[in-house]
Regions:
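Hydrophobic/aromatic-enriched cytosolic interaction surfaces used to assemble or bind macromolecules
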Residues: 1-241
Length: 241
């Protein structure tokens, strides 16, 4: 089960780390990003992505309370997700191009395989200019999709980037779902939210009960063997008489 979550609720960033050990990276990332984040790192969940060509490690950051709320809502609906992915990371990606989707309520931008941001529609032009200015390398092309009924937002002409309007023949969700096989998207279900860890939390309260049950079974087996041996001995005695 693949579940998409709002990209506007997830911060996609990156860090440079010398180690290749995933455990050490997971432990170091929160403190390396502490000064860059407005939120308390103790209240934030960090999911690791891949390294880019420069060796920079992609990281997704989301509020723990928000993660808990998403998973609780899914559990109430009877769903156990295998992947929780920021929606903007399933925008079609093309090397050398950025993808921009205007949908009801906001704008999604994917600027790299594991980078991008969710933008408020009113601030789309400003944020796009700012992101381009902060980017080390400008894209060759800006691919733009617009959902039906969404007003055509003005893209500044002075971006210095070729813009191509893509035809959107399906609802935005279908466009994203078509990329659900995208292996480079960051799965937020890592660390304490990994499937194995979540199952472990479910079973952890029952471990003492399971231990007592195991002891009871061992005792029952021992008593059964003891009684069987007594019966064998009694039968042997009777045959001897």
């Amino acid at each position: 089960v693949v579940v998409l979550v709002p990209g506007a609720d997830v911060v996609l960033t990156g860090v440079s780390l010398p180690t290749r050990n995933r455990g050490r990276m997971a432990a170091a990332v929160p403190y390396l990003l502490e000064d860059q984040l407005a939120a308390d790192v103790e209240q934030s969940h960090f999911a690791l992505g891949e390294r880019d060509a420069s060796g920079r490690l992609a990281v997704a950051v989301v509020d723990r309370a928000r993660m808990d709320r998403w998973l609780s809502q899914l559990a109430e609906a009877g769903l156990q997700p295998d992947q929780l992915i920021p929606d903007l990371l399933l925008l079609p990606y093309e090397e050398g191009a950025w993808s921009l989707l205007f949908e009801p309520g906001g704008v999604l931008l994917r600027s790299a395989p594991q980078a991008g941001l969710g933008i408020d529609a009113a601030n789309a032009a400003f944020m796009l200019q700012r992101t381009l200015a902060e980017s080390g390398t400008k894209p060759e092309r800006l691919r733009v999709w617009r959902a039906e009924g969404v007003p055509a937002a003005v893209i500044p002409e002075d971006l210095g980037v070729e813009t191509s309007d893509e035809t959107l023949l399906v609802p935005p969700l279908m466009l994203l779902a078509g990329q659900a096989h995208e292996a480079r998207a960051i799965n937020l279900l890592q660390g304490p939210y990994s499937r194995s860890e979540r199952l472990g939390r479910v079973w952890r309260p029952w471990r003492p009960v399971a231990a007592l049950l195991a002891v009871w079974l061992v005792l029952q087996l021992g008593m059964t063997i003891f009684h069987n041996r007594q019966l064998d001995a009694e039968q042997a005695r009777l045959r001897a008489e």
